[in-house]
Every structure is written in structure tokens, then in C-alpha cells.
């Protein structure tokens, strides 16, 4: 019995020792655990190496997987940065558009920019004068087919770049965002619009006739339609500009100032009296072409005002009453006294005021009534006076 117990104890002890050795072996072997942990890291490295050939030289260290991943990500970022620096965008639209525009179109944009500065913009501005950017974009989209291939933002930036260019033909921005063509030979500080009014030199162009010392004036003959020279009266040197204007106007000639850059062109055109388009060559207005359809007097600017005729009629009406009642003293209208003061009735107030005062009450308004209204009020006042007198 004791022998059997001893064998059982030995078997149990041997089994326990084997189990203990197997457990110790599993605990004391950390390489297996590290290899399991390094499996996903190695798979990530292999995926990155397959995407970019520049990671083939990465050295993987199985003992320190995290340091290899950090070194690989750093090399990948530097490679991407170097790739971006190899293809810069040097177009005139700015560096912020390098992602939206390929580098192969740089030459095309530079050629479009040259065409804008040298050909299209000078032609448009010399034809239409000062224009805003939106109008320039419209004209360029019609004239330049390659300009329509750009987006609206790129078109605006390219046009702004061309307008602000300091080489070759130069342009200048004036009030309210409008651009004009400026001669490249004239410096920027000598432009007439950039100088104050008191600093503008009082010099006249050589081809522009002067008002004080001119011997001949240009006029246009309506009969033959050709420009002929007509002699003007000699003006004394000591005479002022206003006196010279009066002298020329008294002789039946219209005067004008030659302050525009196209004065030499308009000097050969006749200034028709009473025409609102005299500066365009004396084109007659509709009222001047058919004067029989219109009544009344025309002012110097050729515009007909009906209110002026009504005011003249009203003044004539008041003048007639003033002549008829010239002995009456001037009446001062007091609204408070007329409405609240005194115990007399309205009829007695009308008698005290009189017809002249009632008519003057109408004249106290800011806007004068028409002739018909004044006549109607006059008849009403006279009727009330007659009724009050009969009572």
C-alpha cells in the first residue's frame, strides 16, 4: 500500500514539474510576443513601400518597430514636399491657384497676358474710353476665344494683373473703379486727374486756338456742309475773359472753351444755339426740328419748361390786381389771429381782409398754383363777398 502511494506521488510530482517547465518556457520567451505585436506594423510598412518606391531602402528592425515607422513617415513627407517643389506654378494668377491649374498651361497664360497688355486692352480702352472691369471682361470674352476657357475668378485675376502691369503700355485707375489708357511716356505724377486744381499749368496745346489772342476761328457752314475759316474780331490784350465773351456774343458768334483733349476736332464743328447736343456737332433737338408743334419760349439750353410759362401768367395776374388796388396797404397774414382771435364772424373777416389780401394768401404757398386755379379762387372769393354784402 505504501509502494503504491509512493508511485502515485512520484507520478504527480513529475506531471507537475512538466507543467511548470512548459509554463516557464512560455513566460520566459518574449520574442514570440514581440513578433506578434510587430505583425501589423510590418504590414503597414509593406503597404507604404508598395505605394511609393522611395521607401524601398527603409531598414526594418524587428526589435524596434515603432522607430522604423516614425522614420518611414518622415521620409514619405519629405518626398511629397520635394515632389511639390519640383513643379512650381509661376503663372501670373498667383501661387494659391497652383492646385487648380496645371503647370503645363503656364506658357498659355503668359501668352494671353501679353495679348491683353499689348493688343486687346489698348484697343478696347481707346475705342470705348474708361470702362470698369466687368465691361472689360465682357469685351474680352467676345474678342478673345482663349479667354473664355478660364473660370470667372481666373479671368478677373488675369485682367487685374494685366491692368496693373508696369511694363510697356500702362493703364491707370480713375474714380469708381474705372480704368483708362495712359501713355507710357507720361509719368504717373503728371496725369491731369492726379493733380490738384490750383497746380494745373495754364498752358494751351499748340493746335488749340486761344480765346485771347486768336486771329481765326473755325465754323461750319450749314449750306455747303464744309468747314471754312471765318475771321474773328481782334480782342484787346487788357480785356478780361468775360468782356471778350460779351464782345463775341454781341457780334453774333457763340463762344466755347477748348479744355477737352479733342478740342482740335470739335473746333471745326458749329455750335448750334439752343441745342443740347451742340458738343457733338450741332445736332438739333426734336423741339427745334419741329417748332410748330410746341409753344412757349426756349431757354438757351433748348429745354422747354411749361412751369415757367405758368409762373409768368401768374405774375401778370398779380400785377394787374396790384395796379387796380395800388392804394391798399400790404397785408400780413396771421393764421392764429384769423382762426382764433376776435368775436367777429367769417363774413366780417372777409370784409376786413378784402379781395387783394385773399389773393395774396394764395401767393404765400411755396408752390404757385396754375392760372386756372387762381382764377377759380378769385371767382369764389368775389361770390362770397357778394353773398355777404347781400345779407
Swiss-Prot record:
GO terms for molecular function: DNA-binding transcription activator activity, RNA polymerase II-specific; sequence-specific DNA binding; transcription cis-regulatory region binding. Residues 1-29, 85-105, 189-253 are annotated as: Disordered. The modification Phosphoserine is found at residues 194, 199. Residues 16-29 have a biased composition (Basic and acidic residues). GO terms for cellular component: cytosol; nucleus. Keywords: Cytoplasm, Phosphoprotein. One of its GO terms (biological process) is positive regulation of transcription by RNA polymerase II. Residues 90-105 have a biased composition (Low complexity). Its main location: cytoplasm. InterPro entries: Stb3 (IPR018818). Pfam families: Stb3. It comes from the Eukaryota. It is found in: Cytoplasm. Residues 189-201, 209-229 have a biased composition (Polar residues). Belongs to the STB3 family. This is Protein STB3 homolog. It comes from Schizosaccharomyces pombe (strain 972 / ATCC 24843). The gene is stb3.
